[in-house]
Amino acid sequence: VRRRGRGGKQFRAITVGKIAPAKYPNFRLNEHHLGTIVDIVHERGRDAPLVKASFDDEYYYIPAPEGIAVGDRLEMGLGAAATARNILALESIPEGTTICNIEKNAGDGGKLIKSAGSSALVFSHGIEGVTVKFPSGKKLTVNPKCRAMIGIIAGAGRKEKPFLKAGTKAKYMQAHGRLYPTVRGIAQAAVYHPHGGGRHQHVGRQSSVGRTTPPGRKVGIISPRKTGRSRLKERK
């Protein structure tokens, strides 16, 4: 963790192959704009494809929703229809609608639900704002002026394809700025990891630790409700 905080090259995402920030055009909410999909591109380090959209003779890159194709039209702003691929303010989207690329703060261009195959649900409209339900079950109330795209981010099922080779996964992790490979704790020496040491491939001691355990020793099963066979039955 301390090495990662320094920000060495092996922990930073590579900028080679990056195209542009994937966010909405900074148009006013009271304006209506009609865009055309010019191209669908892949950006290194990003699982979901991007669409190159033309608005008012300017090009913008937006995360691609499912079912979109080159030549399709998409609407944005006031008066846009609440149909797939269109970008509207949350206050204009009916409850129960599937949405993606949601703004956390009005005008930030989209910060939530941008990964491949992800989507959220417009749960309710209230006085404090619009409540959005995420795939994890968590609910978040955001500003009704925040924009979102109707639909599901394209690229679902990407994780179903196996890497097959360690080199393929190494290139993937490098593009995402992640350290690879990681050595198992029980395979390390005792001076490097609490689970290390001994001529055996098991922990050799209790692996559950408390919630307030200091860093460096906080490894294994952290603050479990149960341990042993009863815990395995619950997981099944």
Predicted region positions:
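Glycine-centered tight beta-turn/hairpin loop motif at sheet-sheet or coil-to-beta transitions
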Residues: 55-58, 135-137
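Basic, glycine/proline-rich low-complexity segments that contact nucleic acids
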Residues: 1-48, 69-236
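Beta-strand/loop nucleic-acid-binding surfaces
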Residues: 58-69
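Short, conserved beta-strand segments within well-ordered enzyme catalytic domains
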Residues: 50-54, 61, 75
